[in-house]
Amino acid sequence: MAHIKRIDLTRDVEAHADAYREAIEKVCRETAFSGGKYADTFDKEFAAYVGSRYASGVNNGTSALHLAMLALGVGPGDEVIVPANTYIATAWGVSYTGATPVFADCTPDTWEIDPSVLEAKITDKTKGIIGVHLYGQPFDYAGVREIADRHGLFVVEDCAQAHGAQFEGKNVGTLGDLACFSFYPGKNLYAFGEGGSVTCEKEEYYKHIDRLKNQGCDVRYYHDEIGYNYRLEGLQGAVLSVSLKYLPEWTKRRQEVGHRYIREITNPLITMQHHPENTTPVFHLFVITVPDHEDFIRYMAEHDVECNMHYPVPCHLQKAYTDLGYQPGDCPNAEYLAAHCVTLPLFPEMREDEIRRVIELCNAYRQ
């Protein structure tokens, strides 16, 4: 019986090898390696895809979050509220500025930042809120925005896992003050290495981010502020332009597989993420909870199906943030997820027999 990977990038690379090869060879012939026209072209294409006025390509999603915080004036002494249930880079973007991430629990059903707990987290040091469209499912932007507006706070979208998702008919990446994307391999839109982007509507944010990522200068060798080497490589821009052409097709396929799992996995021991009707998820990850996730992962591995966890330790209990004083029980929903989560295989190139096998194994577990 063939092994089913949690994700298999080789199928896409092989299917579109000629297009990728042609793009890479163009960059090599022109030696357009650092920034340049291929990165700029992708910025325009990605802004058009998202529906934002601007997109500024950067070297990875973590840098995108850092730049967003800097552009919004976050610095030492400030606080920014972030979800406890997310990948750690969401918090890094705050910490890199010298500010403090304040971790908020997730809801028990969508597993995303819970607007009902935000008021208690706000202090006179709070500058804003980062919401994460986790696993490809848009968070409750309206609920978060209402609280943010009442307190004069910014809202940043972490869209690293949600390229093409929608909240109330609007694309993620166009909702908040700024939005951050990742193109890490395995993301719904991915580079051949690392990449990221910041999208926004305000020209002042766009120009500031462009300057910061380019060593703090608008004109070469004239540095107006301390900057960073966060540019998107030309090679990655060219690859991403190719990948972007296929993204709608990949998204449709992810949604087909995701909704198939929702309909056909009926084991009462398995709980799935809730998808509110006013959202359109893109199923970057298909995460479930089970009573004993290590046992479930072993069971699937015995049947040659690879599963893993997103994420085994919530942010507020990570060793790196011990100094903030969080304790077990501070974010109970996020902690429950960490102790029970499993990520099932899901990628656009999954074959019918693989999808059926995952469903059958899930339904047979402990039954």
Functional labels for PLM-detected ranges:
Residues 181-182, 196-202, 241:
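Short beta-strand-to-turn element immediately C-terminal to the catalytic PLP-Schiff-base lysine
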Residues 31-79, 93-97, 103-105, 170:
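Phosphate-binding glycine-rich loop
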Residues 1-32, 37:
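N-terminal "arm"/small-domain region of PLP-dependent enzymes with the aminotransferase-like
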Residues 70-159, 166:
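PLP-dependent aminotransferase-like
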Residues 157-192, 220-224:
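Conserved active-site segment immediately N-terminal to the catalytic lysine
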Residues 92-94, 147, 171, 188, ...:
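Hydrophobic/aromatic ligand-binding patch that stacks against planar heteroaromatic rings
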Residues 56, 81, 102, 155-156, ...:
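Structural detector of well-ordered beta-strand residues that form the stable sheet scaffold
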Residues 10, 22, 39-45, 49-55, ...:
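PLP-dependent aminotransferase class I/II
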